[in-house]
UniProtKB/Swiss-Prot annotation:
This is Ribosomal protein uS12 methylthiotransferase RimO. Gene3D superfamilies: Methylthiotransferase, N-terminal domain, Nucleic acid-binding proteins, tm_1862 like domain. It comes from Moorella thermoacetica (strain ATCC 39073 / JCM 9320). PROSITE patterns: MTTASE_N (PS51449), MTTASE_RADICAL (PS01278), RADICAL_SAM (PS51918). GO terms for biological process: tRNA modification.
Amino acid sequence: MIRVAVITLGCPKNQVESEYMLGILEKNHLEVVSDPRQAEVVIINTCSFITAAREEALDTILELARAANHPRLIVAGCLAQQYASELWQELPEAAAFIGPGATGRLPEIINRVLKGERVLDVPGPEMITGELPRLIEDGKPFAYLKIAEGCNNRCTYCTIPSIKGPYRSRPLEKVVAEAVSLAARGIKELVLVAQDTTAYGLDCYGEYRLPELLRRLARIEGIEWVRLLYAYPTRITPELIEVMATEPGVVPYLDLPLQHASEGVLRRMGRPGTGAAGLRAIESLRRAIPEITIRSTFIVGFPGEEEEDFQILLDFLTDARLDWVGAFKFSPEEGTIAASLPGQVPEEVKEERYQRLMLHQQSITRACNEGWLGREVQVLKEGPEVGRSMRQAPEVDGVVYVKGDPSPAGSMVTVKLTQLYNIYDFLGEIKL
């Protein structure tokens, strides 16, 4: 039996695509191994969103090429989609370059590379609609659920529309069917992802259908939590807020990437609104859902960002009191408008502002978390003595450590939060 390993780089959306790959491999009787050193073929599912992601992908490919077992390498994902023709010449170490649209042909491609053939299979942007099998790690209590592909927003710094194509919603019934299948396999939490989850439905139904989708998913037997990531600020509709406020299975949590608070910087980014508009949106959410947890991400060092703009961002964070914040240093991406804008910020200034922002936010996050000490919360176990509360999205926020709790992954337990382990993580006691 042919042994195949899959390495996933990048975002949760890539994780979903890797799980489809694993499902296809298993269905076609190929042996899936977790250790690439034991594999005859290694598939690297890459990201190319920013320079650092491309560098990580190339380093991974070259490291695997030097491995003692000399596996055949298949480069998949965004890097292959965007740069296949260049990489074909520059990376002879790779046996194949495939785009997401070639996922269904993986068994055939593997057979071809094992016969010594090099393969280039990068069709135009396509979407997996849900017919493919999906293999999820045993014992994992959550799954990312991709509801759309592509993006119609035109942020000046972003390559996603050119890589992934225009926004395409998956049919609602197919999303629900996949969710039912996941629940039947023991998944307790669905984490909705897309380039823009809040645009769901507009392209194929002529109206936003995310509220309806959330209701349907939250009422699936076996699903405890439905969590929403990658929301767009101007699409937080009253209907969406109502569903989040009234549907018990939809967790009071929203990932709302705002990117900046300075009006001038936002305008150069091609993003809507102002810092004041962002604050109003946050206040509306908190009025309707008093205990909502809000996460956001920001870019520092965007072209033209002056110290005054950066201070506006810090002041916004002080006023917004966001629970969780991630930040990126601007990376000029080939083919984007932002890469050629005047006023490029020196790398050392980007780094200094990044450090200041994260330090500034740490005290806010600590204060938010301290406000939960002494309270009892539901925790979804992810392993021995560790899990997450509703306030914590997988892999990006903190966790709750529950000493002496023997319940397995997937269990829902009541925990009293007793102290902070660090800024982001809690210690808790099981409540029997």
